[in-house]
Amino acid sequence: MAYNPKILQKPKEGEEITIKDGKLHVPNYPIIPFIEGDGIGSDITPAMIKVVDSAVQKAYKGEKKIAWYEVFVGEKCYQKFKDHKELSPEEQWLLPDTIEAINHYKVSIKGPLTTPIGEGFRSLNVALRQKMDLYVCLRPVRWYGSPSPVKEPQKVDMVIFRENSEDIYAGIEWQEGSAEAKKLIHFLQNELKVEKIRFPESSGVGIKPISKEGTERLVRKAIEYAIDNDKPSVTFVHKGNIMKYTEGAFMKWGYALAQKEFNAQVIDKGPWCSLKNPKTGKEIIIKDMIADAFLQQILLRPSEYSVIATMNLNGDYISDALAAMVGGIGIAPGANLNDTVGMFEATHGTAPKYAGLDKVNPGSIILSAEMMLRHMGWVEAADLIVSAMEKAIKSKKVTYDFARLMDGAKEVKCSEFASVMIENM
């Protein structure tokens, strides 16, 4: 289907990324929609574009180039389109044209988004993922030489597949004292004979959906990633010891899928199993771990874990805990994916007190752009960004968050850090 925006202008140049036989086909001048983001978005996104354009130019000598196409969500969207009466209040923050563009052009990148204040407004990040069914939140975590609170951060090299569409993030909950909460509690107590609600008169209630289909499509992606990237293991992280029919089912369905679709064989008496990587012949172990024990293990034995598949809430905790071990969320990249669309993003917040000061670390969105280039098959440009990031940090010309933790560092601005990276390509 053609892209026919109602409010935005169509891109003036560039070509569309398409999908043929399940594979991404990327032209030499692809249109990439970008959302600048709120708060520090106006600092970090231009820095990212500068770094990406330089890496692409250096890698391909002008044969390839990105046609950047700005689309809008968040505060900037609201300020720009609040007088458009044909838009609902939600659409003034989350423009329908933007969703259509992200779906149509297949690959996009975004800065951090503020959540509108007021009843009925959800997190815009969550709304974007849910509207487009971007069911995988992909978070690679590795060390680039930045200051770290742990002794051996180089041992951390994990990729988290966090389920994006289910769990308590589905937002199915009711406030304490509301008619809906009272009705649901009454139903649970009287129809289902639930006796475990300790304070029924003053409880808010939420529902945690975990489905077989949602689990299978996430686990399938995680195992495919392990095969494609020659990883030694996939670990299901869950609290199935407590939540047997949701998180326990996630583990059970995960093992069943590995056996059914990837011919994984049970080790000893299970439940761990192993499969042979069809591309390399190496063994991939499929295992699981209780979430609280896993949070200990990533500190004590991080090198034993590689690809992680988990649900929404666990994935949120784990990805931020791992990010802290390698330099913090300011440098943590991420992406939201489904079978056809990839939306790459800065994983931190809008930090409004630093907005417009040209101060903060643009590392998260730059490394998310590196993921984006790799996803597009532009591996040479992606490799340039990784090596430039490592060299820039090693040179100790870094933004304030790293400079205060490094002896002999020279503090540079956000835009200057981008220039330091370009000098190191």
From Swiss-Prot:
The family database entries (Gene3D superfamilies) matched by this protein are listed as: Isopropylmalate Dehydrogenase
Instruction: Tell me the keywords, alphabetical order.
Output: Glyoxylate bypass, Magnesium, Manganese, Metal-binding, NADP, Oxidoreductase, Tricarboxylic acid cycle
Give this protein's Gene Ontology molecular function annotations. Answer: isocitrate dehydrogenase (NADP+) activity; magnesium ion binding; NAD binding
Q: Provide the GO biological process annotations.
A: glyoxylate cycle; tricarboxylic acid cycle
Q: Where is the signal peptide?
A: none
Annotated residues for binding of D-threo-isocitrate: S123, N125, R129, R139, R162
The UniProt family comment states: Belongs to the isocitrate and isopropylmalate dehydrogenases family.
Explain the purpose of this protein: Catalyzes the oxidative decarboxylation of isocitrate to 2-oxoglutarate and carbon dioxide with the concomitant reduction of NADP(+).
Stored NCBIfam families: PRK07006.1, prok_nadp_idh
This protein's name: Isocitrate dehydrogenase [NADP]
Q: Which organism is it from?
A: Helicobacter pylori (strain J99 / ATCC 700824)
**Taxonomic lineage from the root:** Bacteria, Pseudomonadati, Campylobacterota, Epsilonproteobacteria, Campylobacterales
Query: Which gene codes for it?
Result: icd
